[in-house]
Structure formats: structure tokens, C-alpha cells
Amino acid sequence: MVISERALKAVLVAVAAYHVATGLLALVAPDTFFDDIGHYGLENSHYVGDVGAFMLAFGVAVGIAVVRPAWRAPILWLGALWYGFHAINHAFDTGEAKSEGRGWGDTLAIALGAAISAWLARVSERLSRG
């Protein structure tokens, strides 16, 4: 499935906004992030903030990629790797989530994020070639 440049930009704006918002939440309200999103194992506000910093940086980079097409594929491939490794990590820790079902649901959602990021990277590469 090929999408237009305009549609890709709209998707990238949404991806950027999600990561900026989630990153800011983890960075400035780590306890809330832990309780509502990342409830795995014992809480460590510093590490939650570290995750927030990375998510925020990724969101900003995707936002820049909206207007700098040369950035798109590399940033999105980075996202695919990050989400892929993140999903593998979650697969080993499903029992530490609020419930086993939540653990596997999170793992699958994160793996889907990896697949979507890889697909968007390929779309970006195709569009850059004309």
C-alpha cells in the first residue's frame, strides 16, 4: 500500500505528537506514567524519566522529519528497532505488568509499533525515490 506525501506527513505529525505527549508525561510526571502506562516491576522515577527523555527526543525528531524528508527513513528505522527491542524486553516481563493479559497486550501493541514504524520507513524511502 502506497500513501501520498500529504498523508504521510499527517501520519508523521500524529506519531510525533503521541511521542512528545507521552515523553513529556514520563519526564514531568513519572509517577503518573508508571501508574497508568508503564506499571512493570518496581517503580523507579529516574528510569521512567529517562524513557520520557528518549520518547520526547524521538517525537521531536519525527516532527522535524515532517519538514525534512531526508530524516524520515533513518528516524523511522530507528523507531522500528527501538520498538522491536522494546517488544522483546516486554515479552520476557509479561508477568510484571498489572496482569498477565495486560503484559501480553502491551507486548503485542509495542510489536505493532515496530511494524508500523518499519512500514512508514519503507513508504518514506519509496516516496523519496519518486
Question: Can you name each region flagged by the protein language model?
Answer:
Residues 17-48, 52:
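Hydrophobic transmembrane helix segments
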Residues 22, 44-66, 81:
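Core segments of alpha-helical transmembrane spans in multipass integral membrane proteins
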Residues 7, 70-74, 100-103:
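Membrane-helix interface segments
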Residues 112-130:
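Membrane-water interface at the C-terminal end of transmembrane alpha helices
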Residues 88-105:
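Membrane-helix boundary connector in multi-pass membrane proteins
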Residues 75-90, 111-116:
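Hydrophobic alpha-helical membrane segments
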Residues 48-53, 100-113:
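Individual transmembrane alpha-helices with interfacial aromatic-anchor signatures
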Residues 1-18:
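Cytosolic juxtamembrane helix and N-cap/initiation of the first transmembrane helix
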